[in-house]
């Protein structure tokens, strides 16, 4: 109840503000987006672009795009790493199905690279240009819905490596 009252109040205030601005001929610039598209064929965006990041993701391709239940997904990514990734680097991942948070977890980035055999990468990962390929199986049991993912990777000193976000819709069966 309290949420709906507060939400209604905020929506009314926003509508009143918009009406007053148009009534007096005022226009306000759109706030800058903190996301930018990543070249290639994927739904991924680089997020937190207003913050310093040590990985410039130059391209991501998914085959098939969009991903399909019960099929393999081939991920091809390229980027330029500007700082060495050391042991102790970590990644914060959040996955939502609609408004429902399914996962919100921190993982050891170096362990994940080794466990998932990402082109043989192991920490420390030196500065340089990288092209990575990985095939993952999408389970046929994935429930229908709109999935949102955000992943922020940090080095051991808490400097951001990168931030990626995207949405995938799995239609009804």
From Swiss-Prot:
GO MF annotations in UniProt: sterol binding
Propeptide residue span(s): 21-34
SUPFAM superfamilies: E set domains
Classification via InterPro entries: Ig_E-set (IPR014756), ML_dom (IPR003172), ML_PG-PI_TP (IPR033917), NPC2-like (IPR039670)
Keywords assigned: Lipid transport, Signal, Transport
Gene Ontology terms: biological process: intracellular sterol transport
Pfam family, any one: E1_DerP2_DerF2
Signal peptide: 1-20
Superkingdom, natural source: Eukaryota
Homology family: Belongs to the NPC2 family.
Function: Catalyzes the intermembrane transfer of phosphatidylglycerol and phosphatidylinositol.
Self-association state and partner proteins as the record states: Monomer.
Protein name in UniProt: Phosphatidylglycerol/phosphatidylinositol transfer protein
Native organism: Kluyveromyces lactis (strain ATCC 8585 / CBS 2359 / DSM 70799 / NBRC 1267 / NRRL Y-1140 / WM37) (Yeast)
Taxon lineage: Eukaryota, Fungi, Dikarya, Ascomycota, Saccharomycotina
Gene label: NPC2
């Amino acid at each position: 109840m309290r949420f709906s009252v507060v939400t209604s109040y905020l929506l009314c205030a926003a509508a009143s503000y918009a009406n007053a601005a148009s009534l007096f001929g005022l226009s306000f610039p759109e706030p800058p987006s903190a996301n930018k598209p990543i070249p290639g064929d994927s739904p991924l965006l680089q997020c937190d672009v207003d913050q310093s990041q040590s990985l410039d993701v130059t391209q991501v391709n998914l085959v098939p795009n969009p991903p399909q239940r019960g099929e393999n997904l081939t991920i091809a990514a390229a980027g330029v790493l500007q700082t060495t990734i050391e042991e102790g680097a970590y990644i914060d991942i959040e996955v939502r199905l609609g408004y429902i948070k399914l996962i919100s977890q921190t993982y050891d980035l170096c362990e994940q690279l080794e466990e998932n055999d990402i082109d043989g990468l192991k920490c420390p990962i030196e500065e340089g240009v990288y092209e990575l390929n990985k095939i993952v199986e999408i389970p046929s049991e994935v429930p229908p819905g709109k999935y949102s993912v955000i992943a922020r990777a940090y080095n051991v000193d808490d400097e951001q490596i990168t931030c990626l976000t995207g949405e995938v819709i799995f239609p009804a069966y």
